[in-house]
C-alpha cells in the first residue's frame, strides 16, 4: 500500500480478536485497499468510543496510518444504514464474512467486491428471504477471485443454451452432457440445466430449482478453495440437526 495515512475509507469489519490488555486486532475489508489488518488501541476499554463502531455487518468509515502489515486505527465512524442481523440471518452474515476473510488476499484492491459485500449485507440485515442474494454474492466473489467458469459459452465453443444439460467442474470449461439419467449418475462435478447457468450468470433466479442448482455450483467451487470447510456453515448445520431432532 503506497499511502502512509488513509482517511475516511469505507470498510466492513470481518473479524476481531483481543490484542494485549485493552486493544483489538481487526480484520476489515475496505473499498479501495481490500482486506487490511488494523490495530484499535484501547478499543476494549469501557469508555472507548470505538466499542459501538467496530462491529460487523454494517459499514463504517475509518482512518488509519502505518506502513507495516498491521496498521494503526486512527478514527472510526458508523456510516448508518441498517441494524444488525438477528436470528438465522446472523449466520448468513457470519458466513459471508468468513468467505471474504478466508478467500481474499491482504491489501488486494477489489472495489467491485466491496460493493457486492455492501449489497449482500444490506439484504441479510433487512430481508427475511436473502438466499438469492447469497448466491449472487458467492458468484461475484468467485469471479473476483478468477475461478468462476465462463457461463456464456461451453467447452466446445457453443453458447450456453437454456434447454441443454451441462457438467460443471472446478478449473474446467462447462461441458454439455447427455440427459440420460443413467449416464448422468456417473458424471463427476455438478450436473445442472442450462437455464440455471444463465440465471446464475445474470443473477436472476426464475425458479426454486434454479436457485438450488446455483447453490450446488457455488458450494462445489468454494469447497475446492476451502477443503477444510467453513465454521459458520458447520455451526448452522448443527443447529438445523438439533431442530430436526427436537421437532
Swiss-Prot record:
Transmembrane feature ranges: none
Superkingdom of the organism of origin: Bacteria
Gene3D superfamilies in alphabetical order: Nucleic acid-binding proteins, Recombination protein O, C-terminal domain
Classification via Pfam families: RecO_C, RecO_N
Keyword DNA repair: yes
Keyword entries, A-Z: DNA damage, DNA recombination, DNA repair
GO cellular component, as recorded: bacterial nucleoid
Function: Involved in DNA repair and RecF pathway recombination. Involved in pilin antigenic variation.
Family the UniProt entry places it in: Belongs to the RecO family.
PANTHER family documented for this protein: DNA REPAIR PROTEIN RECO
Name listed for the protein in its UniProt record: DNA repair protein RecO
Species this protein is from: Neisseria gonorrhoeae (strain ATCC 700825 / FA 1090)
Gene from which this protein is expressed: recO
Amino acid at each position: 500500500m503506497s499511502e502512509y495515512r488513509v482517511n475516511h475509507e469505507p470498510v466492513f469489519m470481518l473479524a476481531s480478536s483481543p490484542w494485549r490488555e485493552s486493544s483489538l486486532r481487526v480484520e476489515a475489508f475496505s473499498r479501495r485497499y481490500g482486506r487490511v489488518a488494523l490495530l484499535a488501541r484501547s478499543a476494549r476499554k469501557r469508555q472507548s468510543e470505538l466499542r459501538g463502531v467496530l462491529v460487523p455487518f454494517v459499514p463504517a468509515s475509518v482512518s488509519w496510518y502505518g506502513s507495516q502489515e498491521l496498521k494503526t486505527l486512527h478514527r472510526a465512524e458508523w456510516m448508518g444504514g441498517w441494524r444488525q442481523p438477528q436470528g438465522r440471518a446472523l449466520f448468513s452474515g457470519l458466513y459471508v464474512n468468513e468467505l471474504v476473510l478466508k478467500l481474499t488476499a491482504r491489501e488486494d484492491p477489489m472495489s467491485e467486491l466491496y460493493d457486492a459485500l455492501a449489497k449482500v449485507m444490506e439484504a441479510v440485515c433487512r430481508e427475511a428471504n436473502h438466499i438469492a442474494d447469497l448466491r449472487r454474492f458467492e458468484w461475484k466473489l468467485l469471479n473476483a477471485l478468477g475461478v468462476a467458469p465462463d457461463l456464456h459459452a461451453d467447452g466446445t465453443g457453443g453458447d450456453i443454451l437454456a434447454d441443454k444439460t451441462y457438467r460443471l467442474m472446478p478449473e474446467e470449461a462447462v461441458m454439455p452432457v447427455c440427459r440420460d439419467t443413467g449416464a448422468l449418475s456417473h458424471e463427476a462435478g455438478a450436473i445442472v440445466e442450462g437455464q440455471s447457468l444463465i440465471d446464475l450468470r445474470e443473477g436472476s433466479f426464475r425458479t426454486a430449482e434454479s436457485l438450488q442448482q446455483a447453490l450446488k455450483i457455488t458450494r462445489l467451487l468454494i469447497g475446492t478453495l476451502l477443503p477444510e470447510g467453513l465454521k459458520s456453515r458447520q455451526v448452522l448445520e448443527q443447529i438445523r440437526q438439533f431442530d430436526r431432532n427436537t421437532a
